[in-house]
Amino acid sequence: YTLLCYKTPSPINAETCPPGENLCYTKMWCDAWCSSRGKVVELGCAATCPSKKPYEEVTCCSTDKCNPHPKQRPD
């Protein structure tokens, strides 16, 4: 069984994760354009939940397509 996760960069598609990567993650942080564009969002697959830096928000989940882009409607 392989997991389906959304992956950035655009276009954001759900892709099959490589074997051994059984988590989807969403990572968000502010860059220089945060006030006009909002947070940067990175999506992908992981074997273990990525460690969170002080300025990041990181969430992980383990079901298919459980990490949609916050601004994207789930399909």
Swiss-Prot record:
UniProt GO molecular function: acetylcholine receptor inhibitor activity; ion channel regulator activity; toxin activity
Segment forming the signal sequence: 1-2
Keyword field: Acetylcholine receptor inhibiting toxin, Disulfide bond, Ion channel impairing toxin, Neurotoxin, Postsynaptic neurotoxin, Secreted, Signal, Toxin
S-S pairs: C5-C24, C17-C45, C30-C34, C49-C60, C61-C66
Compartments, record wording: Secreted
Tissues where the protein occurs: Expressed by the venom gland.
Job description of the protein: Binds to muscular and neuronal nicotinic acetylcholine receptor (nAChR) and inhibits acetylcholine from binding to the receptor, thereby impairing neuromuscular and neuronal transmission. Blocks muscle type nAChR. Also binds with high affinity to alpha-7/CHRNA7 nAChRs. In addition, shows a weak inhibition of neuronal alpha-3-beta-2/CHRNA3-CHRNB2 nAChR. Selectively binds to alpha-1-delta subunit interface of the mouse muscle nicotinic acetylcholine receptor, with a 10-fold higher affinity for the adult than for the fetal receptors.
Self-association and partners: Monomer in solution, homodimer in crystal state.
Protein name per Swiss-Prot or TrEMBL: Alpha-elapitoxin-Bc2c
Organism (species): Bungarus candidus
